[in-house]
């Protein structure tokens, strides 16, 4: 069973599906590739993609209804891909941002160029019982050293075609 944990299928909320019809087209394509479960992770990037949790949940329910109506064999779950700022943890605590399917896992994206103090951020999240999954690890020049990733105990999500994935084989 394939479980896609990072997708931009949810309609009208970021640079992913533009409407419900396009979202269903993407869902059908995922099914054709053997995906049985998909975590919808629309972007939250300040000043760019800032849909409220209410809007995300509303669009999620519309998509879920259409999937059920068309009797498509896939389960969907809701979360967000969150661009890290100093307010991220506070917003998670206040439910202004979404963890992955209401768990303590959070899909985080950092600046690709300016290295944050990842150890400190991981510690702060750990104190609040959150676990970070790093989106797009292949894009971070400062994390190309596998030993650094192991030291930080980072979980990550990457594309199969990424250079990093091939280097790990």
Residue ranges and their predicted role:
Residues 50-161:
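Extended substrate/RNA-proximal surfaces in nucleic-acid metabolism proteins
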Residues 5-11, 38-43, 107-109, 132-135, ...:
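Short beta-strands and strand-loop turn motifs
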Residues 1-73, 151-152:
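An N-terminally biased module of ancient metal coordination in phosphate/nucleic-acid-related enzymes
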């Amino acid at each position: 069973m394939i479980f896609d944990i990072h997708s931009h299928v949810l309609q009208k909320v970021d640079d992913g599906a533009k409407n419900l019809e396009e979202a269903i087209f993407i869902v059908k394509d995922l099914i054709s590739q053997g995906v049985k479960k998909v975590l919808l992770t629309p972007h939250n990037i300040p000043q760019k993609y800032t849909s409220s949790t209410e809007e995300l949940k509303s669009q999620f329910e519309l998509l879920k209804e259409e999937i059920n109506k068309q009797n498509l064999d896939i389960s969907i779950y809701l979360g967000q891909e969150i661009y890290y700022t100093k307010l991220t943890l506070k917003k998670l605590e206040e439910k202004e941002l979404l963890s992955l399917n209401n768990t303590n896992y959070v899909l985080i994206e950092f600046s690709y160029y300016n290295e944050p103090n990842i150890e400190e951020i991981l510690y702060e999240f750990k104190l609040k019982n959150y676990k970070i999954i790093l989106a797009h690890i292949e894009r971070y020049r400062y994390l190309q050293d596998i030993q650094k990733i192991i030291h930080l105990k980072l979980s990550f999500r990457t594309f199969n075609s990424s250079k990093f994935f091939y280097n790990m084989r």
